[in-house]
Regions:
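N-terminal leader/targeting segments and the immediate start of mature chains
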Residues: 1-53, 214-216, 221-232
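Sec/Tat-exported extracytoplasmic proteins
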Residues: 33-37, 88, 121, 147
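Surface-exposed coil/turn segments at beta-strand junctions on protein surfaces, enriched
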Residues: 34, 70, 157-159
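One face of beta-strands
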Residues: 37-45, 50-67, 73-77, 82-86, ...
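An acidic-aromatic
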Residues: 59-131, 196-200
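Transition segment at domain starts
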Residues: 131-142
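A short, amphipathic edge element
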Residues: 143-151
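Gly/Pro-enriched, hydrophobic low-complexity segments
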Residues: 153-216
């Protein structure tokens, strides 16, 4: 006969991953992420030594969203399959990876690009870096990496969902919060070495990617002209 002072099972009503070891929880989270069709990523990531704030919706064949460099430019990215577009304001295009004072001609040319979807070709030096922000597989492989001995950390709630944390290297190698309700998706990652914090939401929620209308696009065939980040 159970007494009224009996403690409630902390895993009651959960998916059960809270009972697993840290390595098992991490493996479940990784498997869930790999099997998802779509996700929304928001937070801070470090790429090639530079810090970027991102808010991207991603799926298998592309992605769309906003990227802003720390103390630097803000721009929008849209990718459908191999077609990558960048949208930014005139100030972004006026500087386009160049320093110093801009000429009147530079400013005039930049004004024509403001608010347009500029095609970034695969030959552009920045194509690989920019397209990585829109590639679900590439981003998830890079983000879901912990370094050091794993242990089960604290439980909390993220976006109203109960989570359990996997901690690596006593926290210095990263912290991954995994959903305890529904599929064990990773919901938040604090990357090791101060390399950013990213939240993951809307797992499996499909969305439509649309190619910009012809009048909204500019095809910059000149190598290096379509990015503004080639020097990053």
């Amino acid at each position: 006969m159970s007494g009224c002072g009996e403690e409630q099972d902390p895993d009651e009503g959960t998916n059960g991953v809270g009972k697993l070891t840290a390595k098992q929880i991490e493996a479940k989270a990784r498997k869930s992420a790999e099997g998802a069709d779509a996700v929304r990523l928001s937070g801070t990531v470090v790429s090639k030594g530079s810090s970027y704030r991102i808010d991207m919706r991603l799926k298998e064949n592309g992605g769309v969203g906003e990227v802003s460099a720390k103390d630097g430019p803000r721009f929008e990215l849209l990718r459908l399959a191999e077609s990558l577009y960048l949208k930014a304001d005139a100030d972004f295009w006026a500087h386009d990876g160049k320093g110093g004072k801009q000429s009147a001609a530079d400013k005039q040319a930049a004004g024509k690009l403001e608010g347009k979807y500029v095609r970034v070709h695969s030959e552009d030096p920045s194509y690989k870096q920019l397209s990585a922000f829109t590639d679900m597989k590439v981003l998830m492989e890079g983000l879901l990496s912990l370094d050091g001995e794993r242990e089960v950390g604290e439980r909390k709630e993220i976006g109203g969902v109960r989570t359990v944390q996997v901690m690596a290297g006593e926290g210095g190698g990263g912290r991954l919060d995994v959903a305890l309700v529904g599929k064990p998706y990773p919901l938040r990652l604090e990357r090791g070495g101060g390399a950013g914090v990213v939240e993951m939401a809307e797992w499996g929620k499909d969305f439509t990617l649309r190619k910009p209308k012809k009048e909204q696009t500019v095809d910059h065939g000149e190598p290096g002209a379509g990015s503004g980040l080639s020097g990053s």
